[in-house]
Regions:
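Conserved ABC ATPase "signature" region
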Residues: 51-66
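Conserved ABC ATPase signature
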Residues: 70-74, 78
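Conserved catalytic motifs of ABC-family nucleotide-binding domains
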Residues: 91
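H-loop/switch region of ABC-family ATPase nucleotide-binding domains
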Residues: 131-132
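H-loop (His-switch) and adjacent beta-strand-loop-beta switch element
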Residues: 144-156
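ABC ATPase nucleotide-binding domains
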Residues: 162, 169-198
C-alpha cells in the first residue's frame, strides 16, 4: 500500500503507475482534539477545495450535517466518515483504506463497509483494503494478498483459503469456514487492471 501511495520506493520487481489520483484513509491519525477544528476545516488542511466539492464528499459519506461540528465532538464512526470524505474529495481512481473500521462499533463497521462499496460503485474507483478482519476480507473482496512478513499467497478468496501457507497461519478450520464464501459480482478484472461489466 505504501508503494501505491508513493511513500516507499520498490526494492525489487516492477511497479507500473496507473494513476496519480489516489485517496488514502490512514489507520491512525494524530489530532489534538482540543483544537477547534471543524469538519470543513479538516477537509482543506492540506489542499484547497471549493465548497461544492466539500459538500459533495461529505454528503456521499453521510456526514454533511457534521461539517460545522468540531472533530473532537465526533464519534469514531463519524470521524472515519469525515476521513473517507477527505480521501474521496478529488474523486480518486484508487482508494487505499488502512484498517478503516478501527475504533468503530459493530453496527458502524457494517455501515462503513456498505458505504465503501457504494463509494467504489459511484466513483468507479478501485479499493485497496488493508484489514485483519478475515471475515470481511474473504467475503467482500475480489482479490486477497495474505502477508506474514512476506507474500504468503494471493488470489481469489477461495484460492487463498485453499493455500497451504494460509492454512498454516489460520488453521484448517478457519480455512474451511472462510472458503465457503463466494464473491459474486457483475464485472471482470482485466490484466491491465481495468474493470469491465459482464
Amino acid at each position: 500500500a505504501k508503494i501505491a501511495l508513493g511513500i516507499y520506493k520498490k526494492i525489487d520487481g516492477s511497479v507500473e503507475k496507473y494513476t496519480n489520483k489516489v485517496g488514502y484513509v490512514p489507520q491512525k491519525m494524530s489530532i489534538d482534539w482540543t483544537l477547534p477544528l471543524r469538519g470543513n476545516d479538516f477537509m482543506i488542511l492540506t489542499e484547497s477545495l471549493n465548497k461544492e466539492t466539500i459538500d459533495e464528499a461529505l454528503s456521499l459519506t453521510g456526514v454533511i450535517h457534521l461539517k460545522d461540528k468540531n472533530l473532537g465532538d465526533l464519534s469514531g464512526g463519524e470521524f472515519q466518515r469525515v476521513l473517507l470524505a477527505r480521501a474521496i474529495s478529488k474523486k480518486p481512481d484508487l482508494l487505499v483504506l488502512d484498517e478503516p473500521v478501527q475504533g468503530v462499533d459493530f453496527t458502524g463497521e457494517i455501515a462503513l463497509y456498505e458505504l465503501i462499496k457504494k463509494i467504489s460503485d459511484e466513483l468507479d474507483c478501485g479499493i485497496l483494503l488493508i484489514s485483519h478482519d478475515l471475515h470481511t476480507v474473504m467475503s467482500a473482496t475480489d482479490h486477497v494478498v495474505c502477508l506474514n512478513g512476506h507474500v504468503c499467497c494471493s488470489g481469489s478468496p477461495l484460492d487463498v483459503a485453499k493455500n497451504n501457507e494460509y492454512k498454516a497461519l489460520f488453521g484448517e478450520q478457519a480455512s474451511q469456514i472462510l472458503s465457503r464464501y463466494e464473491h459474486k459480482h457483475d464485472h471482470i478484472h482485466t490484466d491491465e487492471g481495468e474493470i469491465k461489466k459482464n
